[in-house]
């Protein structure tokens, strides 16, 4: 007896489903799901896989997204506790880990999250040996180093979301002051994602007009307009949002989808993201910090050599020393 489906549809070939643009998100907390929905809305994947240890929450989030399939263009949304659901991913976004508590520094989280990564990373490598790893969990620079060490991947394929969001916050706040859309406000925050990030005031511009040339005190203590406060707001913003709503999610989700787009579409856009910077700016250790990187289908293919003031370079070196001080104590 022919089924309804048989009566309706005449099959022409037996297809093997192998995804070509699969993205996995590890961790279905607020950040993971914000990344997932942002990636879905940008139509970057032909399959999205979600992984977590909390099975009920995981299944619920998957179903909730599947029920929106009519409004999306990603034909397959899957999930599982077992990493076999992640097989053949081109990009794996890692958001899993202990969440930063109110008032807790990102660095304080570190050993808790290293232990989680010791389980996650080998499983990802097993099922998607050719993927790019995009680390979002905090402290992101150290955990990107941890992911690189555990995975054995070449450094171009291990990327930290880094200062992509810090720079976006900076450009938003700058735009608010000037009455200009953030896309037209150019400025870079480099170094550590977090408390010791470095604003590159010399490069801040609108339409190629250097703000530092117009206003030489820009970013200094002598500045009567207190532009330095903009960077302080960037540093404080995550803490403020956590204090108000308990966590951050939307902006980091959008930031991650922005990076995913550059990778999946091989855009070769320049982003301030965390990469291994040994050999740059006099840094001699295996540390990951944000510098402007060209991002495409192979991950980070090139780094843009930014001219920093001696003060900015010293700041970056200090960040590197702080991170290395923590990294060398880590138990793998």
From Swiss-Prot:
The active site is at 193 (proton acceptor). Signal peptide: none annotated. NAD(+) binds at residues 29-57, 99, 138. The modification N6-succinyllysine is found at residues 5, 118, 318. The modification N-acetylalanine is found at residue 2. One of its GO terms (molecular function) is identical protein binding. It is found in: Cytoplasm. The modification Phosphotyrosine is found at residue 239. The modification Phosphothreonine is found at residues 309, 322. Belongs to the LDH/MDH superfamily. LDH family. GO terms for cellular component: cytosol; oxidoreductase complex; sperm fibrous sheath. This is L-lactate dehydrogenase A chain. PANTHER family: L-2-HYDROXYCARBOXYLATE DEHYDROGENASE (NAD(P)(+)), L-LACTATE DEHYDROGENASE A CHAIN. The modification N6-acetyllysine is found at residues 5, 14, 57, 81, 118, 126, 224, 232, 243, 318. It comes from Sus scrofa (Pig). It catalyses: (S)-lactate + NAD(+) = pyruvate + NADH + H(+). InterPro entries: L-lactate/malate_DH, L-lactate_DH, L-lactate_DH_AS, Lactate/malate_DH_C, Lactate/malate_DH_N, Lactate_DH/Glyco_Ohase_4_C, NAD(P)-bd_dom_sf. Its EC number is 1.1.1.27. SUPFAM superfamilies: LDH C-terminal domain-like, NAD(P)-binding Rossmann-fold domains. There is a cross-link at residue 57 (Glycyl lysine isopeptide (Lys-Gly) (interchain with G-Cter in SUMO2)). Substrate binds at residues 106, 138, 169, 248.
């Amino acid at each position: 007896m022919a089924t309804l489906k048989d009566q309706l549809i005449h099959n022409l070939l037996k297809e093997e489903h192998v995804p070509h643009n699969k993205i996995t998100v590890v961790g279905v907390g607020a950040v993971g799901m914000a990344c997932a929905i942002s990636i879905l809305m940008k139509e970057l994947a032909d399959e999205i896989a979600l992984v977590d240890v909390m099975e009920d929450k995981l299944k619920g989030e998957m179903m909730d997204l599947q029920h929106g399939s009519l409004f999306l263009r990603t034909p397959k949304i899957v999930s599982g506790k077992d990493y076999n659901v992640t097989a053949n991913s081109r990009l794996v976004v890692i958001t899993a880990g202990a969440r930063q508590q109110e008032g807790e520094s990102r660095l304080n989280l570190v050993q808790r999250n290293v232990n989680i990564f010791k389980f996650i990373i080998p499983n990802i490598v097993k099922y998607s040996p050719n993927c790019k790893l995009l680390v979002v969990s905090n402290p992101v620079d150290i955990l990107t180093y941890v992911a690189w060490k555990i995975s054995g991947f070449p450094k171009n394929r291990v990327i930290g979301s880094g200062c992509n969001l810090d720079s976006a916050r900076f450009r938003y706040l700058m735009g608010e002051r000037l009455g200009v859309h953030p896309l037209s406000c150019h400025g870079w925050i480099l170094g550590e994602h977090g408390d010791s990030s470095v604003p590159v005031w010399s490069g801040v511009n609108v339409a190629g007009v250097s703000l530092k040339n117009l206003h030489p005190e820009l970013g200094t203590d002598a500045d009567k307009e207190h532009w330095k406060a903009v960077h302080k707001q960037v540093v404080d913003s995550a803490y403020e949002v956590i204090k108000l709503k308990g966590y951050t999610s939307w902006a980091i989700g959008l930031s991650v989808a922005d990076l995913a787009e550059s990778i999946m579409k091989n855009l070769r856009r320049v982003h301030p993201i965390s990469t291994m910077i040994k050999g740059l700016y006099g840094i001699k250790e295996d540390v990951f910090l944000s510098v402007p990187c060209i991002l495409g289908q192979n991950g980070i293919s090139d780094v843009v050599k930014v001219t920093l003031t001696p003060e900015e370079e010293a700041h970056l070196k200090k960040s590197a020393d702080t991170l290395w001080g923590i990294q060398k104590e880590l138990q793998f």
